[in-house]
């Protein structure tokens, strides 16, 4: 089964960008080529700065490629949470920001006549098991002035009490972004290896960038020396399937813990859910989604399936603004918590305003320097959980060897007296590399759903061969394939039906 999203499969106008070689100086540098980084670069260039964007792999290949692409202020249960922790004023401010973000995306699509499947839909949010929670959501949204209605709705999960918001939007995110004119330079396959926060120099594999303004938009912030983001963010993975031939005329979101998200696309519907902390949980998400889709839409073919990762803050608000106290002209965008479309547009304007010294109504709302109770308690729990993963991983020493690894699977094993991660190809070929994440040395975990190695502490991910996929790690795992002995190589080979090798 393919693991490309429906957006990637239908992204036919893919343009290649060069790798940065050499040293350059610019007015603004954006690190990270997702929707947040791209829109931030767009706004910084719009304000007259010579702007460069660098992406470690391919433009829009990360979280943006795996989004369900809903442009909406109707974001699950966020408003009651904000109202409880910070009061209605903050909840209303967040609602206003999302309306502005929606308007920004719509204006850009109209201004540049972008054909990206932009479509207005109704959005239904509900708890299929707790109507009181649905009523509470409606009450909060009414109190803050959100345009919603409490209705009995026919959803894919059946007839439920739901909060309906009209005039929300869905679109093809990659077509939108690729059609948005880039008045800035783009470099792909250009991974930031270090950030000198004093001299504002970012070093890459084959060059460096000196910038007056630096924006870190890498999903997970990569400057560990400031901001304590490894404690303030939880890496979360979600799973989605595309069901061919199924239909839905709105978007649907069940806010119970294991609830699902459904939205139409050109050719069927996407069904998403089974969110979990990266590197943890059982590995039956896609099977669960297929079973749920069959229950809702009958037996229909699944076109593709994919996973996406995002960072979640502990009060539900993104971190957008100054990276840390004492750092001048260095900014961060992170923590969208799976709601990155409208938030990216808001973040782009906020960063451009801060860089140019303009006031922005949402600076305090999204400030990475905020120290509120919703942040503190979640941060404390995250510190203990991350410490537990670090300690347990370093105390664990496997007894099994490479012989125990099944074809097409990975496992942490004992190899030449050391703990190594080993992957076995379907033909029996073995690959071995360091089992500890190069970021903070937590033990990696094999994800059989995506055929990747994931870090449960901070969400670094590596492909089956140990090559880096996503930050905060900045390098791939060290290879140890040369340590695989002849006996283990022989055990790894598939035997033919006649018993020969």
Segments (PLM) and residue ranges:
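Rieske [2Fe-2S] iron-sulfur-binding domain
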Residues: 241, 412-497
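Glycine-rich FAD pyrophosphate-binding loop
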Residues: 46-66
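C-terminal catalytic lobe of FAD-dependent flavoproteins
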Residues: 256-257, 266, 286-287, 299-379, ...
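N-terminal Rossmann-like FAD-binding beta1-loop-alpha1 element of flavoenzymes
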Residues: 24-53
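Active-site substrate-recognition segment that forms the wall
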Residues: 111-119, 208-209, 214-328, 343
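Extreme N-terminal leader/targeting segments of oxidoreductases
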Residues: 1-28, 477-480, 493-497
């Amino acid at each position: 089964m393919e693991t490309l999203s429906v957006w990637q499969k239908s992204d036919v106008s893919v343009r290649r960008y060069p790798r940065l070689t050499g040293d350059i100086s610019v007015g603004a540098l954006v690190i990270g080529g997702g929707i947040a980084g791209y829109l931030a670069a767009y706004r910084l260039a719009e304000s007259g700065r010579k702007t460069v964007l660098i992406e470690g792999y391919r433009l829009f290949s990360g979280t943006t490629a795996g989004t369900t692409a809903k442009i909406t202020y109707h974001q699950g249960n966020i408003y009651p949470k904000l109202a409880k922790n910070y009061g209605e004023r903050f909840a209303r401010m967040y609602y206003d920001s999302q309306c502005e973000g929606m308007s920004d995306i719509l204006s850009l699509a109209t201004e540049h006549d972008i054909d990206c499947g932009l479509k207005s839909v109704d959005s239904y949010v509900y708890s299929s098991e707790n109507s009181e929670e649905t009523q509470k959501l409606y009450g909060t949204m009414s109190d803050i002035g959100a345009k919603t209605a409490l209705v009995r709705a026919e959803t894919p999960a059946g007839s439920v009490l739901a909060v309906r918001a009209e005039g929300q939007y869905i679109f093809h995110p990659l077509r939108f972004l690729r059609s948005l004119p880039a008045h800035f330079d783009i470099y792909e396959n250009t991974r930031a290896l270090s950030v000198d926060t004093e001299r504002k120099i970012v070093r890459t594999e084959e060059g460096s960038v000196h910038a007056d303004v630096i924006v870190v938009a890498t999903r997970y912030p990569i400057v560990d020396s400031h901001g304590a983001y490894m404690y303030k963010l939880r890496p979360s993975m979600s799973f989605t399937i595309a069901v061919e031939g199924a239909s839905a005329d709105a978007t649907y979101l069940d806010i119970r813990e294991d609830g699902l998200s459904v939205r139409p696309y050109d050719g069927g519907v996407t069904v998403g859910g089974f969110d979990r902390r990266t590197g943890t949980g059982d590995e039956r998400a896609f099977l669960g989604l297929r079973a749920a889709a069959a229950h809702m839409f009958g037996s229909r073919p699944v076109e593709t399936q994919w996973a996406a990762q995002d960072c979640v803050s502990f009060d539900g608000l993104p971190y957008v603004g100054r990276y840390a106290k004492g750092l001048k002209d260095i900014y961060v965008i992170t923590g969208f918590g799976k709601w990155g479309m409208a938030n990216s547009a808001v973040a782009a304007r906020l960063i451009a305003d801060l860089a140019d010294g303009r006031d922005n109504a949402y600076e305090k709302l999204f400030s990475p320097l905020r120290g509120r109770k919703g942040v503190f308690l979640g941060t404390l729990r995250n510190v203990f959980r991350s410490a537990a993963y670090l300690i347990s991983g370093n105390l664990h020493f496997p007894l099994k060897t490479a012989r125990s690894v099944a074809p097409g699977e990975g496992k942490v094993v004992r190899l030449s007296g050391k703990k190594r991660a080993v992957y076995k190809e379907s033909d029996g070929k073995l690959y071995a590399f360091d089992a500890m994440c190069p970021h903070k040395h937590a033990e990696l975990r094999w994800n059989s759903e995506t055929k990747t190695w994931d870090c449960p502490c901070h969400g670094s991910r590596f492909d089956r061969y140990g090559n880096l996929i996503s930050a905060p790690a900045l390098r791939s795992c060290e290879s140890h394939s040369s340590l695989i002995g002849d006996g283990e190589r022989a055990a790894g080979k598939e035997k033919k039906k006649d018993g020969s090798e």
